[in-house]
Regions:
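An N-terminally biased module of ancient metal coordination in phosphate/nucleic-acid-related enzymes
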Residues: 1-71
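Active-site environment of divalent metal-dependent phosphoester hydrolases
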Residues: 44-47, 82-84, 142-146, 170-173, ...
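Catalytic cores of alpha/beta
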Residues: 180-181
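Mid-to-C-terminal alpha-helical segments outside catalytic/metal-binding sites
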Residues: 208-242
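Short acidic/histidine-rich active-site segments
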Residues: 190-206
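Active-site neighborhood of phospho(di)ester-bond hydrolases with catalytic His/Asp-centered motifs
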Residues: 2-4, 38-40, 76-80, 136-138, ...
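Extended substrate/RNA-proximal surfaces in nucleic-acid metabolism proteins
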Residues: 49-164
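Non-catalytic positions within long, well-ordered alpha-helices that form the structural scaffold/packing
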Residues: 30, 129, 186-187
């Protein structure tokens, strides 16, 4: 499996607090069957100012420790970018931490506020698409607007967005409503990727296998392979070549 959304880079957001916890999280992921991890710290303007240079520096330190500890895992980095017009300034400077390229499109992990979908979000998405950037919308099943009005996701499907649900939503960690919406969206074919959104060993570990088993049982092995390996691989493969 490939995990393309997690907060393992130590000390730069609300994820792993230090190097020791980061290494513990990586080991947990490996034990769970993960072979590649894309580290995606929050880029949340005014809260977590994780510019590309900050992320690169943190990644280099973690990668060195992983090699020193002889841990066998492929690592790369991007960011979970909070929806904000300020992202366009970084995009113009080519300083927005993105996923890789696939079929002529660059992909970006984009986070909506948990409480709502802001007015004008569709215009921002349209602008990104004109720049050949496809947003991968993080955890739509946990957004209050979508929980209350699930069909609102369709406007972003029409715009060409991809969607990533959280593994622990599938297994019920966030409650029955989030679980039901995640499974409904998967059944309807709206979801391309499942990822851990790991933050800590205790609160939200980087575990995918239980969610994969549930998806396999409900929707078949082919669907599970797409969500947990094929699609994550396709949009991040080039990251592991740099």
């Amino acid at each position: 499996m490939i995990d393309i959304h997690c907060h393992i880079l130590p000390g730069i957001d609300d994820g792993a607090k230090d190097m020791a916890e980061a290494l513990s999280l990586i080991k947990l992921a490996i034990e769970d069957g993960v072979s590649r991890i894309v580290l995606t710290p929050h880029l949340h303007f005014g809260r977590f100012e994780n510019t590309l240079s900050v992320i690169k520096q943190s990644f280099a330190a973690l990668e060195a420790e992983v090699k020193r500890a002889d841990i066998d895992i492929a690592l790369a980095y991007a960011a979970e970018v909070r929806l904000d017009s300020e992202m366009l300034d970084l995009l113009a400077k080519d300083e927005l931490p993105l996923y890789g390229c696939y079929k002529g499109q660059q992909f970006m992990l984009l986070e909506f506020p948990h409480s709502h979908i802001p007015a004008g979000t569709d215009m921002l998405v349209k602008y990104l698409k004109k720049q050949n950037i496809t947003p991968v919308i993080a955890h739509p099943e946990r957004n209050r607007d979508l929980l209350e009005t699930p069909h609102k996701i369709k406007q972003f499907i029409r715009l060409g967005c991809w969607f990533q649900v959280t593994a622990s939503s599938i297994t019920g960690h966030f409650g029955e409503a989030c679980q039901a919406l995640a499974l409904t969206y998967i059944e309807q074919g709206f979801i391309q990727i499942v990822a851990s959104d790991a933050h800590s060993v205790k609160r939200r570990p980087p575990l995918l296998s239980q969610a994969r088993s549930k998806v396999t049982a409900l929707f078949g092995e082919e669907k599970a392979q797409q969500l947990f390996y094929d699609n994550p691989y396709n949009i991040t493969a080039s990251l592991f070549e740099r």
